[in-house]
């Protein structure tokens, strides 16, 4: 979250699954937990729970966060309507033109940013929801969008994050039977392999609880249940691939946290809530159940 307050950092987010309002509420939920150590879900914040309105205490917390929200809104541009490859390209070029210039030198088109230090992250969430037009199949639409992102990445230095879903049904079951694990593979990506071929880094997120796996990499999934996730670097043009790490995911507030290694966990029950991450850190020699943050650079 600290990057969102960096003046050189800007996000262009194509949210095809949820509204801009809900996306901002999700970010606010993370911020409230980090700052106030309170678990408020997006439904709580938007007063969409069965219980009704927020309590006065929580309402005041949300009010105190309004200046932060306004600052974040200036750093994130959200598109939450339907999207096809052509609209993606045109809106992205328009946004980049606000932050720089497209010029032609020696017959080649170049991009000169107003701020050479600026980092522009472009998120498409998710590619499988692109609307296919002009007689193209969904695969052709995804492939075209991916090619356009590569072109703008190479010309403008943007960092595209193309989120895709996996087709897990038959793949995970057969693999689990053979190997005892349903780990993500690039071949699992649904609708098109194009983006994975274009990407410099591919990361897969896997939930073994859905595959009814009792033990995964030493972790007791029966106790961790839906909290547990595995993150695997499936492709990496800059270093090692097929490297995995294990994390806890708390969907209510949208945070990922790395747990201790399984040999240092003696009480699994506390991992059902993210509040364990607020416990005082212990010395390196005695770090049982000690929380760790997990950072990714894309």
Model-derived regions, located:
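Functional beta-strand-loop-alpha-helix junction segments that form "active/interaction loops"
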Residues: 77-88
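Helical hairpin unit composed of two closely spaced alpha helices linked by a short loop
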Residues: 103-105, 109-132, 136-150
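Signature of the SF2 helicase/ATPase Hel1-core->accessory helical subdomain module
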Residues: 129, 165-172
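Structural recognition of the conserved hydrophobic beta-strand(s) that form the central parallel beta-sheet
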Residues: 13, 123-124, 158-165
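C-terminal regions of RecA-like/P-loop NTPase motor modules
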Residues: 6, 33-43, 53, 66-70, ...
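Walker A/P-loop NTP-binding active-site region of P-loop NTPases
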Residues: 1-49, 126-131, 198-200
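Flexible beta-alpha connector loops of hexameric P-loop NTPases
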Residues: 50-54, 77, 131-143, 174-183
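A short helix-to-beta-strand connector/capping loop
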Residues: 62-79
């Amino acid at each position: 979250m600290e990057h969102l307050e960096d003046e050189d950092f800007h996000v262009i987010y194509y949210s095809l699954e949820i509204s801009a309002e809900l996306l901002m509420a999700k970010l606010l939920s993370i911020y409230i937990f980090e700052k106030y150590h309170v678990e408020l879900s997006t439904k709580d914040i938007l007063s969409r729970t069965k219980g009704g309105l927020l309590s006065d205490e929580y309402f005041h917390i949300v009010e105190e966060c309004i200046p932060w929200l306004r600052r974040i809104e200036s750093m994130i541009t959200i598109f939450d309507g339907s999207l096809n490859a052509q609209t993606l390209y045109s809106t992205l070029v328009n946004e980049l033109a606000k932050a720089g210039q497209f010029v032609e030198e020696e017959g080649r088109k170049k991009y000169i940013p107003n701020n050479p230090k600026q980092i522009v992250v472009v998120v498409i969430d998710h590619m499988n929801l692109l609307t296919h037009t002009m007689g193209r199949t969904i695969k052709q639409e995804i492939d075209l969008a991916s090619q356009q992102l590569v072109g703008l990445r190479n010309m403008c230095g943007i960092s595209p994050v193309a989120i895709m879903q996996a087709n897990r049904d038959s793949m995970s079951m057969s693999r689990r039977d053979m190997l005892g694990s349903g780990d993500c593979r690039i071949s699992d990506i649904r609708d098109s392999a194009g983006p994975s071929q274009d990407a410099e880094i591919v990361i897969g997120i896997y939930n073994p609880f859905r595959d009814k796996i009792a033990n995964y990499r030493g972790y007791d999934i029966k106790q961790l249940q839906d909290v547990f996730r595995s993150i695997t670097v499936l492709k990496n043009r800059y270093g090692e691939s097929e490297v995995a790490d294990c994390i806890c995911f708390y969907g209510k507030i949208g945070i990922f946290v790395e747990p201790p290694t399984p040999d240092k966990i003696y009480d699994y029950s506390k991992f059902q809530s993210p509040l364990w991450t607020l416990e005082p850190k212990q010395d390196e020699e005695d770090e049982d159940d000690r929380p760790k943050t997990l950072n990714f650079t894309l």
